[in-house]
């Protein structure tokens, strides 16, 4: 029987703050217009998009286009709680599901990289948007 290790973050009061993931989403200009329209109708979704690490300048090599009309969408969040049932997550999941139902899954890419080594979720066509998983150890 193999032992599995889980990572659970503990806050400064001793309570668990939950399972965290890195999440990337990219899409065509046309799909980005749908994302922007959805954000205008859903406050939690808009706040989620505005919390994108590219917009906050975490990686200055990649210009942010958060909620900018006329551009492809490219979003990245580090160490976030991405759970089913959270309104913002459900909004993005709903958009991706809608695109899948229309057979337009090639117009977006999504990667969720969890804390567990085997917790990887890829939807749409991430490679078409230069989204890839790269786990490494730096010494």
Where are these regions (language model features)?
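Short, extreme N-terminal segment that most often corresponds to the first beta-strand
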Residues: 2-40
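Charged interaction segments
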Residues: 38, 42-43, 48-139
